[in-house]
Curated annotation (Swiss-Prot):
The lineage of its organism: Eukaryota, Fungi, Dikarya, Basidiomycota, Agaricomycotina. GO terms for cellular component: membrane; mitochondrion. Pfam families: SNase (PF00565). It comes from the Eukaryota. This is Probable endonuclease LCL3. Residues 256-282 are annotated as: Disordered. Its EC number is 3.1.-.-.
Length: 292
């Protein structure tokens, strides 16, 4: 049952007037105390407030808006904190690394687009970060006079289709011997806001599709699930005969390929020639069943 709005009594009215008088009296007392404060104190307080505001603005700009042009600008503090940075992939030249343009803060997308990612090669010079995807090893392309591994072109095509021209998030881990930033890479979520959520783990995607193997050499870095998760995903791709495992699991891995050429560099017969002669001596039936 609703309460009946009885009219205010005379006592309530007088009490409200007394409260107003008390407030007015206290306000006068505060103004009087403020008048006794020396003017220089106000100057110090204003200077302190301005300094605090300036420091806060600098921190926000440094943390959220200042761009990292290239790997040389990545500081030890970034690596110690394993900082996540956002950027647009501008080129994919190899099967397990790429270059991306750091895009911090706002202004890169509509409706608040007032900054742009360069597209010309001369504009991108020294303005991109070279990223090595952590935890995986992909088939080697032909370079330095070495032949490409089987499925190298297919692995490169997959990676380009997956990330080229797209936004990714990189967690900076360390700088490798080639000056690349070893990083955990996540794609932007498809439907959820990228500022609050991150998408799939790129390394796990590569393993799942069969276009990479788990990197197990010195300095290997893995995601939250550790090496066990990576090996499990790789095994699932092997069982399903995906990607580089389409013809079996006994092919030469990227790690074995690089080890073979490293040993050959120390002396001896070129590994490609020795391997070709060995293959010729084997019968076609033996080569066929060796992939199982």
């Amino acid at each position: 049952m609703p309460l009946i709005p009885w009219p205010a009594s005379a006592d309530d009215s007088s009490k409200g007037k007394d409260d107003e008088k008390d407030i007015a009296t206290k306000a006068k007392e505060l103004f009087a105390l403020a008048g006794e404060i020396p003017p220089e104190y106000f100057s110090v307080a204003a200077f302190a407030a301005g300094s605090l505001s300036l420091a806060a603005s600098y921190f926000v700009h440094k943390r959220y808006f200042r761009r990292i042009p290239n790997a040389e600008w990545v500081s030890p503090n970034h690596l110690a904190r394993k900082r996540w940075i956002k950027g647009r992939v501008t080129s994919v030249g190899d099967n397990d690394n790429f270059r991306f343009y750091h895009t911090p803060g706002i202004g890169w997308r509509w409706p608040l687009k007032f900054r742009r990612v360069p597209t010309l090669t001369k504009e991108l010079k020294d303005q991109t970060i070279h990223v090595r995807i952590a935890g995986v090893d992909a088939p080697e392309n032909a370079h330095f006079g070495r032949p490409a591994q089987p499925y190298a072109q297919e692995a490169l095509a997959y990676l380009r289709a997956r990330i080229l021209g797209k936004t990714v998030f990189c967690q900076l881990i360390r700088r490798d011997q080639y000056g690349r930033m070893v990083s955990h890479v996540r794609l932007a979520p498809r439907f959820l806001p990228a500022t609050l959520f991150r998408g799939p783990n790129l390394a796990e995607d590569m393993l799942r599709k069969g276009w990479a193997t788990t990197y197990e050499q010195h300095g290997a870095e893995y995601g939250e699930g550790g090496v066990e998760r990576y090996k499990q995903i790789e095994q699932e791709a092997k069982d399903a005969r995906r990607g580089i495992w389409a013809k079996g699991v006994r092919g030469e891995t990227p790690a074995e390929y690089k080890r073979r050429y490293a040993q050959a560099a120390d002396g001896g017969e070129p590994p490609s020639k020795a391997r070709a002669e060995k293959e010729q001596k084997r019968g076609w039936l033996q080569r066929l069943f060796s992939w199982k």
